[in-house]
Amino acid sequence: MLRKKTLRDVDVKGKRVLVRVDYNVPLDEQGNIVDDTRIRASLPTVEYLLDANAKVILMSHLGRPKNRDPKYSLAPVAKRLSRYINKEVKLAPDCVGEEVKRIVNSMKEGDVVLLENLRFHKEETECDENFARELASLGEVYVADAFGTCHRKHASVYLVPKFLKPAVMGFLLEKEITYFEKAMVAPQRPVVAILGGAKVSSKLEVIKNLIRRVDKLFIGGAMAFTFLKAMGYKVGNSLVEDDLQDVARDLIDVAKKLEIKLYLPVDFVIGQEVSENTPTKVVPWQEIPDGWMGLDIGPVSVELVKEIISDAQTIVWNGPMGVFEIDKFKHGTIEVAKLLAQSSALTIAGGGDTDHAIHKAGVYHAFDFVSTGGGAFLELLAGKELPCLVNLDDKEA
């Protein structure tokens, strides 16, 4: 995958460099940035370009606006970024059009312009060729650095690098791909994957791919109940995808054939409904009564995870172990985060909920790498090619 060229492979001095960043940051009701991790993640690329005296043109989307909606403006992002790089970041009034061309053409070396929200134009998500050509005309070099949208076939991600050459990876994208390859392509073994989340359907391709690549796989979260029911156990009112029973049985068989150790939780914290006020108790996996549902993994399962990862050299984690937004049911997820943080293995985690849980556990810095992409991270784990890489320049053999 890293046969793609990176920023270090091209001359950017004095050039207009068009960078697709991911500034899709959460905002509160007043339009203030709640978490600027994604802005900070782009700094190595932006600062490298400034050091090289490039003219830096940044483009991103924010949210899912139906049309031009001021509440989705990138203005707060321009302000925050300028604080980090200690220079003015000019917010263009749009991302295409005559006024934008004029602003870009009058840039001096070391200037930074942030184009307004790409999704103010439906052509972005429609992957429209003319829109992509217009964006491409703004730059002399294209840099892909928006891992969070890498799995989307959108104009700025997929088509612009087709029309604007050279087209290379920025440092964030390079880092994401490098760590993924360390975990999945040429890993130190044993490799352990820990998967959580609610639905098998959303992780099906991931499970199918991982079963062929890892040595041990632990499936937690509500996904576990679909597997337990497929094995003939009662799971009370726990969330189950009945249409995936056969698929779950097949996956269990594949794991057996490949001699991959597939683990499920051995106890659960159960409640009568998904709420802070529900009564709770801890029961072994085969004793969930009718009218109750599993909402977190129990303490014995946490010990099981500890045992599973004890000899691991590489650990990949995606998805919470329970309904961790509710305090009563966050314990399993928080404890797993802490266990991985203490491990000497290479630890890589990804996915919005997972990222949130690691922050909640206060162990973010103890992980080797936490991916900035949710969907893109899952696509990689599922063994799929990312649209954002397709049209980038290949390194010479």
Curated annotation (Swiss-Prot):
Keywords: ATP-binding, Cytoplasm, Glycolysis, Kinase, Nucleotide-binding, Transferase. InterPro entries: Phosphoglycerate_kinase, Phosphoglycerate_kinase_CS, Phosphoglycerate_kinase_N, Phosphoglycerate_kinase_sf. Pfam families: PGK. It is found in: Cytoplasm. ATP binds at K203, G294, E325, G351, G352, D353, T354. The keyword Transmembrane does not apply. GO terms for biological process: gluconeogenesis; glycolytic process. Monomer. It comes from Aquifex aeolicus (strain VF5). It catalyses: (2R)-3-phosphoglycerate + ATP = (2R)-3-phospho-glyceroyl phosphate + ADP. It comes from the Bacteria. Belongs to the phosphoglycerate kinase family. Pathway: Carbohydrate degradation; glycolysis; pyruvate from D-glyceraldehyde 3-phosphate: step 2/5. The gene is pgk. HAMAP family: Phosphoglyc_kinase. Substrate binds at D22, Y23, N24, R38, H61, L62, G63, R64, R119, R152. This is Phosphoglycerate kinase. One of its GO terms (molecular function) is ATP binding. The keyword Zinc does not apply. One of its GO terms (cellular component) is cytosol. Its EC number is 2.7.2.3.
